[in-house]
UniProtKB/Swiss-Prot annotation:
Keyword Chloroplast (UniProt): no
Protein's UniProt name: Nucleoside diphosphate kinase
Active site positions, chain numbering: H118 (pros-phosphohistidine intermediate)
Keyword Transferase: yes
Organism ancestry: Eukaryota, Fungi, Dikarya, Ascomycota, Pezizomycotina
Top-level EC class as recorded in UniProt: transferase
Gene field: ndk-1
E.C. no: 2.7.4.6
GO term, biological process aspect, one: CTP biosynthetic process
Cofactor: Mg(2+)
Catalytically driven reaction(s): a 2'-deoxyribonucleoside 5'-diphosphate + ATP = a 2'-deoxyribonucleoside 5'-triphosphate + ADP; a ribonucleoside 5'-diphosphate + ATP = a ribonucleoside 5'-triphosphate + ADP
Subunit description: Homotrimer.
InterPro entries: NDK-like_dom, NDK-like_dom_sf, Nucleoside_diP_kinase, Nucleoside_diP_kinase_AS
Amino acid sequence: MSNQEQTFIAVKPDGVQRGLVGNIISRFENRGFKLVAMKLTQPGQAHLEKHYEDLNTKPFFAGLIKYMNSGPICAMVWEGKDAVKTGRTILGATNPLASAPGTIRGDFALDMGRNVCHGSDSVENAKKEIALWFKPEELNQWNHHSAAWIFE
């Protein structure tokens, strides 16, 4: 299978509190992606500041960190063909009001500050985010037997 890659997807505290984790997992599984790592975690302020370090000069940074630190986060690594690009498509636009119906944000979110989930925006950032949130031994390598029925 060409363009096999991994992406980091996180269900943010609002998504966890609203009971959307299972639905979000289903969206990725139904599309044909393979879940290789998952944990429910409250990583703390320092970890979140590192994750969002590219936004640290933005006026909303402190509020973002406070919100992300307000409850558990479901951190996941998904693997498959064009996982980063397709994962972002499944999530929808960062601003839920600009997200198409049928996307996670288009179906479950209304406010940019409570947009339910995070997804890596590039292959390079996916690698960095996966390394920040997971140890190498937490990434499971297993055979996705339905892959033959999903990919040529």
